[in-house]
Amino acid sequence: MKTTRREFIGATALAAGGLIAGNAAAQGSPFYRGALLHLGSNMWGDYPAGPDDLAKSAEEEKTHPNPISPSGSPTPYHSYLQCRDDLWRQSVDRLAAKKMNLVFIDLGEGIAYPSHPELAVAGTWSVEKTRAELARIRSLGIEPMPKLNFSTCHDSWLKDYHRMVSSQTYYKVVADIIADVCAIFDKPALFHLGFDEEVPVAGKGLFHAVYRQGDLWWHDLLYTVKQVERNGSRAVMWSDKICDGREAFLARMPKDVLLSPWYYGTNFSEKNLAWDASYEKKNGTWEVQRNLAASFVALNDAGYDLLPCTSNWSRDEAAEALVSFCKTRLDPKRLKGIYTAPWQRTIPDDKKKHISKTLEGIDLFAAAMDKHYPL
């Protein structure tokens, strides 16, 4: 984290032609198969006072436990990095062993942003360390792509800016950080922006809950997408916003955005694939997501490029079900790949599975891909 802003800009000056390079990479991209892995994890929960007031290590947390959130359990937000280097490398190496070619890296508090060093926590990776790992990942035949979640229900990694959403200060920070990341990643072909689950039900466990809707949500989304595009990458985002209102989503979502529909169940029956508009206004409960499977068909039929995501979060059979569905029902010209998201911090197993759940998720997804999309 010793890199100054001036040094950082100087070191990346040779990438000034990245707009062309990034777009060329996106246009000539392979069929992606990979996973979302967590370097940062402050995308859930938040803090009652200052973002740096919590324990700075796992050892300190034993005597200074995290505060209880409104959900009744300790907040999952941490003032230190929840990623162990050896387990991170083990996860990436498993992707390589399974012949995956894509890893979305959920960054959050995981890396230093030269424009905003205040976003670091104890253990945050320096720019130099991040670049070294990106080079190692590429040497394994895997394209590392960044992910930052700008959903107001998943953006506690922004620290105090998490509480300044839609302000001029916020917009500047968004632009600064995206520029930093595109430079660190050397103009990645894809840049995942998250933007999922920005609904009232998702904020019930937060100390500070806010969500955008209507024109403001669209303004902020399109502003964020523009920052990605001006830095030479293609924006990727979760597409569950369609569940709030299909017609409005299809009317306003640009086709340049690569949509990532997700569904972690196994029910791809015709009944479950039929859109039920009655769920669109139920964003006070998780029933609002009852059209997740149906959204694949809606987006496919509307002509969007898709990068679907599965997970072993709740069902080990989910990868097989989703990959099989993609193979038989989605337009191959619009399907840009498939990936899995185990949704685990990169830490040792404790009372719950963490690293083992991640590795199992990669294995389950690889088996499904080998069956339906053999290399």
Where would I find each of the regions flagged by the language model?
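Hydrophobic beta-strand residues in large extracellular and virion-surface proteins
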Residues: F8, A35, P117, Y304-L306, ...
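Feature activates predominantly on carbohydrate-active enzymes
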Residues: Q27-E229, S233-V236
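N-terminal export signals
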Residues: E7-A26
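Catalytic-core regions of glycoside hydrolase
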Residues: N101, V165, I184-P188, D196-D370
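Short, cationic motifs built from Arg/Lys/His that form the positively charged side of catalytic pockets
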Residues: R5-R6, M43
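Secretory targeting signals
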Residues: M1-T3
